[in-house]
Amino acid sequence: MRILLSNDDGILAKGLGVLERAAESLGELHVVAPDREQSATSHSLTLHHPLRPVRLGERRWQVDGTPTDCVMLACEALLEARPDFVLSGINHGPNMGEDVLYSGTVAAAMEGLALGIPAIALSFAGNVLRADALLDTQVGAIRSLLHHLTGLPAFPADTLLNVNLPAVPGDEIRGIRLTRLGRRVFSDSIARMKDPWGRDILWIGGGSVEWSGAPDSDFRAVHDGYISVTPLHLDLTHRDVLNTSTEWWQEP
């Protein structure tokens, strides 16, 4: 099996190295990843300047572009044949709830899906320091999870699986839960401050967070020490609203 690995934290990221170790027994690995941090780039493409892939090894490339660029170039230009699976991650931080709208990690997997390739996005639901400390202990659990997911007798069509790993040592992971996206609400997420010259600047990020603890949500699973697996797809149509259009829609 031919596996494409990418991420949004960059080619040198700890999480990518852990993913390589966990996935090496799946088959032939090809790594095509950004040459620098590309977090929160979502599904953006580089359209207004050329991209320069740099070959670092027999099956290893870095690209001066976004995670989506990396997957597109890998599948359309760099690999001799398309991969059987796209694996993206392991992100240094969670991708749950609304995170998936901004995540370059999820976007890389979504680009694989858009190209017709089964895909899995993986994220560590803790901060960078905890990722550095704990990811090595989770390699065995991640390896088992990947073998299970890629070996499913009927991997769901038109679907990527969004995986979040709890921030606990590998031997404390309690199991796996199939989940839905939860909801997270940020407050005071824009910090106002001054630059060294006294000018106003705004910084996005931080603030307090409230999350949905619904029993079937990704947040609840990870909070309880489980790996969450959430199926996502490209179709953003709100079908419940579409199916009840007679209740609210009026022809202009």
From Swiss-Prot:
Gene3D superfamilies: Survival protein SurE-like phosphatase/nucleotidase. InterPro entries: SurE, SurE-like_Pase/nucleotidase, SurE-like_sf. Keywords: Cytoplasm, Hydrolase, Metal-binding, Nucleotide-binding. GO terms for molecular function: 3'-nucleotidase activity; 5'-nucleotidase activity; exopolyphosphatase activity; metal ion binding; nucleotide binding. Its main location: cytoplasm. A divalent metal cation binds at D8, D9, S39, N91. It is found in: Cytoplasm. GO terms for cellular component: cytoplasm. It catalyses: a ribonucleoside 5'-phosphate + H2O = a ribonucleoside + phosphate. Its EC number is 3.1.3.5. It holds the Pfam family SurE. It is an enzyme of class 3 (hydrolase). Transmembrane segments: none annotated. Its cofactor is a divalent metal cation. Binds 1 divalent metal cation per subunit. Belongs to the SurE nucleotidase family. Nucleotidase that shows phosphatase activity on nucleoside 5'-monophosphates. This is 5'-nucleotidase SurE. It comes from Gemmatimonas aurantiaca (strain DSM 14586 / JCM 11422 / NBRC 100505 / T-27).
